[in-house]
Regions:
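Active-site proximal beta-strand in glycosyltransferases
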Residues: 14, 55-60, 71-91, 106-109
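Short hydrophobic beta-strand element within catalytic cores of glycosyltransferases
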Residues: 215-224
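Conserved donor-binding/catalytic core segment of Leloir-type glycosyltransferases
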Residues: 135-156, 162-165
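Acidic donor-binding loop of glycosyltransferase active sites
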Residues: 188-201, 214
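Donor nucleotide-sugar binding/catalytic pocket of nucleotide-sugar-dependent glycosyltransferases
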Residues: 89-90, 102-135, 141
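Short N-terminal targeting/anchoring amphipathic segment
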Residues: 46-66, 82, 192, 196
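A charged, aromatic-enriched C-terminal amphipathic alpha-helix characteristic of glycosyltransferases
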Residues: 255-288
Length: 292
């Protein structure tokens, strides 16, 4: 949102509930309990926003009013619309289950891995504000800190991370249950970051780690890597690993402070090229301009 505002766009963030993830939201509906009361609150919000909004950019498969009505209503009102999928909201779903999104003016996914489920979507990676993140290169120490921050141990493959680190001379730090500010301070102390071992692509946690200049290990689908490198003209610096190969992928980083530093620097440069919020804002504005 801040990157759009820096480009003189009157952008507002509206959420259903504020939670810890979006303390910066301009408006939280703080929806009441009960389906009918929630629907009424959302209809009222839509009625308030419609006259003053040119582009409705929805996230995570959520809309203000029922999906069957949301996009036809916006089109009738002469408003532009975008449905921005984040990954877990589409992963494994059939084309029929996602057919409703074809009514939006455009669809966005954050990676070429997610494009498997929405082939006609624009691929616009997540952006972060790099002006607020100074690199903290990995430390030159014999026993490096491996950091892992699972939102779900099962989905992220945490038990395999624990088992792999037990075979290496490292200090494993698992970050859980903290607000983002406190968690981010711990990210700064890492020498190596392990994201996840199941999903096939990386998320915001890995992007933040790379922005800090940390080498990142996670599981990546080969085809998504190829398409990403073709689209952006830069090599994806993340080391891909599975449950079975994690130890061998970590070992060179554990044994070589120089390799940790080299890969960390390359990772920061990659984020500057692919994930800078100002670059992403320009891509969004280009998409908005092309909507009918």
């Amino acid at each position: 949102m801040q990157a759009l505002r820096r480009k003189d766009v009157d952008a507002r963030l509206v959420v259903f509930e504020r939670y810890q993830l979006h303390p910066e939201a301009d408006w939280s509906l703080d929806r009441p309990s009960g389906l009918a009361a929630r629907q009424l609150a959302q209809w009222r919000a839509f009625a308030k926003l419609a006259p003053r909004t040119d582009v409705f950019h929805f996230y995570f498969g959520l809309t203000l009013v029922p999906k069957s009505l949301q996009f036809p209503l916006l089109r009738a009102l002469g408003k532009k619309s975008v449905m921005h999928f984040l990954g877990s909201d589409i992963r494994g779903k059939s084309p029929h289950e996602l057919e409703w999104a074809q009514r939006a003016g455009a669809r966005i996914v954050g990676s070429y891995d997610a494009a498997r489920w929405v082939p006609d979507a624009e691929v616009i990676p997540p952006g972060i504000d790099l002006s607020e993140i100074d690199p903290v290169p990995p430390a030159d120490r014999e026993r490096p800190v491996v950091l892992h921050a699972p939102s779900s141990r099962r989905r992220k493959g945490t038990e395999a991370v624990i088992a792999a680190c037990a075979q290496l001379d490292v200090e494993l730090q698992i970050v859980e249950g903290l607000d983002h500010r406190k968690a981010f301070e711990l990210y700064r102390t890492a020498d190596i970051v392990v994201d996840q071992l199941n999903a096939g692509w990386y998320g915001v946690f890995a992007i933040e780690a790379m922005a800090l200049g940390k080498p990142v290990v996670t599981f990546l689908h080969d085809e998504a890597v190829r398409r990403t490198q073709e689209a952006f003209g830069v090599e994806v610096p993340i080391l891909s690993a599975t449950h079975e190969t994690l130890v061998e992928r970590l070992r060179p980083l554990v044994e070589s402070p120089e390799e940790r530093g080299r890969l960390g620097a390359v990772s920061r440069a990659y984020v500057e090229h692919v994930h800078d919020a100002d670059v992403i804002a320009d891509r969004l504005l280009d998409l908005y301009a092309r909507l009918s």
